[in-house]
Amino acid sequence: LFRSQFSADCYEGGYVMIDIPDAGRFLVVPEGAAEVDDLPEDVVVLRQPLDHIYLVSTSVMDLFVHLDALDSIALSGTKAEGWYVEEARQAMQEGRIAYAGKYSAPDYERILAAGCTLAIENTMVLHDPEVKEQLEKFGVPVLVERSSYESGPLARMEWLKLYGILLNKTEMAEEVFRQKVEQVAPILEQENTGKTAAFFSITTNNLITVRRTSDYVAQMVGMAGGVYIFDDLEGETSAQSTIKLPLETFYA
């Protein structure tokens, strides 16, 4: 296992208990299976099929594409023009996925009208806890994914398995993940080239945004045989993936 931010325990009858630290526990119940009595109050029941999902966390979309599960997503928290995933942009342009507002301002009326079975958010929603509370009040379970808290690229990719569980595509998820790990293996075995690389963007007020040293992008540079040039940058918190630098510091 590469991941550390979720665990999954399988039980007889196809039931699966998912535990996401600081985000909750979820019992996935197979379609047609009996309800489970006397569950702890903190456990959220997710009954399959989960086929009308409101997807807010953009990093999850590519994993759904790899699981051939775009048809499970009914609503998006990103507009069509905002998607970097071509399949998602096309699905929205064709009307197969509708825009239902960003994480801080969801269109509750549209979400309810679509019969939403699950909202997948990232930790940004924790800055607007009333949104999560309102969705749950309307009967829409909310799963806050924490893949951004994982320690490396393969750990983030392993969240594919969690969505495989939710979508009843466990075998496909396991196989896709295995293939991806095999593809990366030869790269990990090569010697470091010693070549340095930077990964950055420039803000409108002329600050340089760079990835901190332990961020997954910086790790990918190392995995590919390079040396991330900012080898001593850390954020104020473990969840902070970027740091802003003045131009003078960046070029120093």
Question: Residues of each region from the PLM?
Answer:
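Short, exposed beta-strand/loop patches in secreted or surface proteins that constitute
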Residues: 6-11
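A short, structured surface patch at a secondary-structure boundary
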Residues: 14-20, 24-112, 118-125
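Ligand-binding pocket segment of bilobal, Venus flytrap-like solute-binding proteins
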Residues: 16-19, 231, 239-252
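Stable alpha-helical elements in mature extracytoplasmic
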Residues: 49, 56-63, 69, 107, ...
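Extracytoplasmic substrate-binding proteins
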Residues: 52, 96, 109, 113-207, ...
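Alpha-helical, coiled-coil/dimerization segments enriched in small aliphatic residues
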Residues: 209-240
